[in-house]
Amino acid sequence: MSDSIIELKNISVHFQNGSESIDAVKNINLAIEKGEIFGIVGYSGAGKSSLVRLINLLHHPSSGDMMIGQTKTVKNGNVLIKGKELRNLRQKIGMIFQHFNLLDQSTVLGNVLFALKHSKMSKEKRLEKAKKLVEEVGLFDRIDNHPSQLSGGQKQRVAIARALANDPEILISDEATSALDPKTTKQILELLADLNKRTGLTIVLITHEMQVVKNIANRVAVMRDGEIIEKNSTYSIFADPQKPLTKEFIESASGNQEALEKILRQPEIARLQKNEFLIQLGFSGSSTDEPLISSLAKNYGVSANILYGNVETIENIPIGTLIVVLSGTATKLKQALDEIKKQNVKLEIIKEGK
Amino acid sequence: MINWLIKVLPNVVSMGWSGDYGWWAAIYQTLYMTFFSAIIGGAIGLVFAIILVISDDDGILPNGKIFWLADKIVSIFRAIPFIILLFVISPFTQVLIGTTLGATAALVPLSLSVAPFYARQIQVVLKSVDTGKIEAAQALGANNWDILVIYMRESFPEIIRVSTVTLISLVGLTAMAGAIGSGGLGNTVVTFGQQSKYDVVWIGTIALLILIFAIQGIGDWLAKRINHADMQ
């Protein structure tokens, strides 16, 4: 027995839109562990939204099997639960959205109370719980406000309180921070990470921004055209991406690509001298501890001019990037590059002087 | 004062306030027809609107056949001009009310004419509720009844707004119902107008305008007051 709380086997979603046939999700196998934060990254139209809507059966699969906790919900493409049973399952799966989807004509409290409508608790208990939830997301002073009186971040907090009302075991976040500014995004992600830590809530987070998963996800899957093209721990995805699309997402999150483009436009780099190399070094984990640059100077007489450096910590493991110009005699340079290759460092020669 | 009124508005004064053909009777008949046909026609229209929204392809209980049927019924009744509908359904009115003449008999064609108009307006209003809100409610485990409540509550200010529009067009229809002897302000204006008694025409028109502006004013005020969403 695994600890999977969500298990998808050979799941596909097929739409027929007039004469057009669309495969939104293609043959996906995925097991999400209890208590983890699982990120799904992809551009819009990659099938992320369709995939997560299978979990709470807002969308129905065309084929495959699905287990939620101990409940078999889909077998051979047939949905096994419906009616009250399905509504009870949905209460155990919270969901938050890019555009919040709050009830505009209800107050903050009213929005949270709506989620408790089918709870077995007494009216007083429900009110008490709703108030506690609003307090937990830090909006107690806004409890009688309507959504139009709140900022985007506050609206998303209300949506989170509402999604947590029935004590779900799973929270689905559908681009929940995509409409928010960077500072608010950070606060919302911190709130989610805190919930995960305190209550063991399993979070499935879909986004088109690698920055979002970098901050909180334990594992990441990259989706394209309805398929998961790469799946790994967040650290491994960032330290050692395999697919070009994954690299593209990571570069967009780190700013390394942008830095490199600026460096290449500099005149001294454009006119790189003979016996000069422009290289990019990728360090990860323990290799960040080695004094590589200074050892190159000491052992080979090769000087390294650092143009750009960046260190990020993912799941407490540092990942660093350096862009440097190495210069020295031809033989020493070759030896130095061989030495770098021997180390646990990723070497990329970007430009060689002539 | 009275003498001056008799001089300026001779026919208005001779109609008198009370009596079967007085001003009060005309005002009362207009209010009576507007109010009751709004309730009956409004209820029928609302039911059709809800059927159209939930049975639509993207509704919560899609059903092609029911949608088709409801859609066709609304379209057909919407297409028949009111003045023709008055006579087309008169056998039905005879069975239902026992007569085809008078204000009560006029409630039948008025209701049947306003229902499809209202149904289409409410249909548009309910469809404009963000599907994200419906999806969020479903994700929370809401049942179909909860979702219907969300449709109604989230669009309530808009429902008030289109109800106001419907009520005003209904006042217009009551004037035409005069053709079957319904009475009312509109009928009074038309009858006296044909006899070139223009003082009654002016006063009757002013009374109708006051009624329409009152409905519009109350509707706008109410819609604004109960709305908590951002103004579009």
UniProtKB/Swiss-Prot annotation, chain A:
Membrane topology: Peripheral membrane protein
Single GO molecular function: ABC-type D-methionine transporter activity
Family: Belongs to the ABC transporter superfamily. Methionine importer (TC 3.A.1.24) family.
InterPro entries reported in the protein's UniProt record: AAA+_ATPase (IPR003593), ABC_transporter-like_ATP-bd (IPR003439), ABC_transporter-like_CS (IPR017871), ACT-like_dom_sf (IPR045865), MetN_ABC_transporter-like (IPR050086), NIL_domain (IPR018449), P-loop_NTPase (IPR027417)
Reaction it catalyzes: L-methionine(out) + ATP + H2O = L-methionine(in) + ADP + phosphate + H(+); D-methionine(out) + ATP + H2O = D-methionine(in) + ADP + phosphate + H(+)
Chief place of localization: membrane
Binding site residues for ATP: 42-49
Protein name: Methionine import ATP-binding protein MetN 2
Keyword terms: Amino-acid transport, ATP-binding, Cell membrane, Membrane, Nucleotide-binding, Translocase, Transport
Location of the ABC transporter domain: 6-250
GO CC annotations on file: plasma membrane
SMART domains listed in its UniProt record: AAA, NIL
Superkingdom of source: Bacteria
Summary of subunit composition and partner proteins: The complex is composed of two ATP-binding proteins (MetN), two transmembrane proteins (MetI) and a solute-binding protein (MetQ).
